[in-house]
């Protein structure tokens, strides 16, 4: 899905910044608390370590291709699923994710822009998605003890009547009895969702995140019909992070075909793929379980 709100792709956090865990803090969040770039994974910068994440699935065609590539490379990823996409046809893909050592997490029930819906609607949909994910873990025969959530479009905090982080804490207290839900953004957007992206360009972007150089991002334009769309634009990366959390989508052909190329590049350049819960900022520090 279009990440039209996430306009900054590389974090500028100092390597000396203190790592912290991305649970909502025990305070009241206000409208000044927004902007996803403050929530990266600086512990990975300059390490050559990357955490792969895939949003918006499961997809009946593209998700299996990505799982095949990950299995061949013995690499683990995190899949932020839309639980409305899970049905009898796609549930086996969720089970396969878990059986093969990946993390399954919530990206919501549907791909709503959090800033455009009321408090009641947003809370109900996010809560449902987490309950859905818990049920999927149970059905697949796995323990649900890693609670991650990713805001669609990285959109949060722009409502005047409520703040999403405060509601996320409410949901967690109601479902687990503690502040347990990690919110997970990213350091590098692969741009796989931009119209016209090829697998080769997705690979080139990954290389730029490690080595610097040309990077394909996007700009939003209006068509003659008055609709908005995104087109590719090229920028230079002069100071690459050389590590971080990577955003991809398992509903995109460019990622389904490009992930093998990325994993080959990782292997040939002595880089490392780590799972999200191995990253300092996203480690599980609480013994949380869903209430019975």
Question: Which residues are covered by each model-predicted region?
Answer:
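Catalytic domains of cell-wall/extracellular-matrix polysaccharide-remodeling enzymes
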Residues: 88-89, 111-267
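N-terminal signal peptide c-region/cleavage motif recognized by signal peptidases
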Residues: 12-14
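Active-site beta->alpha N-cap acidic-glycine motif
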Residues: 21-146, 151, 272, 279-281, ...
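Positively charged n-region of N-terminal signal peptides that target proteins for export
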Residues: 1-4
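Boundary at the C-terminal end of the N-terminal hydrophobic targeting segment
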Residues: 17-19
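Low-complexity, Gly/Ser/Thr/Pro-rich intrinsically disordered linker/tail segments
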Residues: 252-292
């Amino acid at each position: 899905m279009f990440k039209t709100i996430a306009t900054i792709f590389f974090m500028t956090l100092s390597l000396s910044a203190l790592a912290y865990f991305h649970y909502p803090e025990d305070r009241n969040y206000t409208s000044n608390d927004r902007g996803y770039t403050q929530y990266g994974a600086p512990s990975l910068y300059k390490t050559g370590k990357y955490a792969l994440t895939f949003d918006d699935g499961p997809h009946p065609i593209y998700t299996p291709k990505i799982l095949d590539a990950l299995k061949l490379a013995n690499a683990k990823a995190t899949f932020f699923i839309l639980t409305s996409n899970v049905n009898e046809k796609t549930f086996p893909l969720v089970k396969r994710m878990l059986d093969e050592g990946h993390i399954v997490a919530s990206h919501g029930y549907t791909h709503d822009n959090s800033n455009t819906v009321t408090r009641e609607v947003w809370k109900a949909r996010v809560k449902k998605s987490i309950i859905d994910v818990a049920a999927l873990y149970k059905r697949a025969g796995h323990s649900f003890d890693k609670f991650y959530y990713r805001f669609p479009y990285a959109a949060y905090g722009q409502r005047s009547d409520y703040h999403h982080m405060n509601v996320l804490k409410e949901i967690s207290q109601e479902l687990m009895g503690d502040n347990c839900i990690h919110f997970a953004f990213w350091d590098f957007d692969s741009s796989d969702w931009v119209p016209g992206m090829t697998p080769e360009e997705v690979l080139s972007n990954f290389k730029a995140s490690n080595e610097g150089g040309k990077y394909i991002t996007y700009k939003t334009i209006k068509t003659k019909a008055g609709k908005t769309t995104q087109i590719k634009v090229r920028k230079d990366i002069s100071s690459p992070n050389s590590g971080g959390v990577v955003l991809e989508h398992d509903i995109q052909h460019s990622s389904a075909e490009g992930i093998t190329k990325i994993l080959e590049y990782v292997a040939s350049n002595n880089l490392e793929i780590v799972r999200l819960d191995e990253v300092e900022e996203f480690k599980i520090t609480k013994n949380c379980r869903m209430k019975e």
